[in-house]
A protein has these predicted regions:
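Active-site helix-to-loop segments that bind/position phosphate- or nucleotide-bearing substrates
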Residues: 1-153
Length: 153
């Protein structure tokens, strides 16, 4: 665990640098609601892909909550959070905490967002498939070679 709360402090600085000095994570505002919605879309895609590959979503590596059925999805979403943050930053322009239909439609489209994975341009959704496939290969071979997505500069 993070007994000194360094992860929390780093997150606070990161979000304030990205969204402004007044930003507080988990407030009921447009940015937080869009972030939560976007993370949920990605997590749902990860859960679906894990299930397709026959993996038990309960058995996480770093996340090990007894009441969370999706620990593994929470592990695998981490490299996607910065991509979602950048995506939300570019989309959310108002302070209305209610997410409009149009904004939700645009947020769902993150699954088509272009990223680099295995040195090729692909959709974020396809990169999830590549990450899960590489995780399965890591489990079976014992050699860690995970296919993480990268932002396109």
């Amino acid at each position: 665990g993070d007994k000194t709360n360094r992860e929390g402090l780093a997150a606070k600085l990161y979000f304030r640098n990205l969204f402004g000095s007044d930003f507080i994570r988990f407030y009921d505002d447009s940015v937080n609601n869009a972030l939560n919605y976007c993370y949920q879309i990605i997590k749902s895609s990860i859960i679906r892909t894990l299930s397709i590959y026959g993996l038990n979503t309960y058995l996480g590596v770093n996340h090990k909550s007894k009441v969370n059925n999706f620990n593994l999805a929470y592990d695998l979403i981490e490299p996607y959070r910065a991509i979602a943050d950048k995506y939300v930053y570019a989309l959310v322009k108002d302070d209305n905490p209610e997410l409009s239909f149009e904004l939700r439609r645009q947020l769902i489209n993150i699954l088509n967002y272009p990223v680099i994975c295995e040195n090729k341009k692909c959709s974020l959704e396809y990169s999830i498939d590549l990450l899960v496939k590489s995780y399965v290969k890591t489990i079976s071979s014992g050699e860690v070679n995970l296919s993480f997505p990268k932002l396109i500069e």
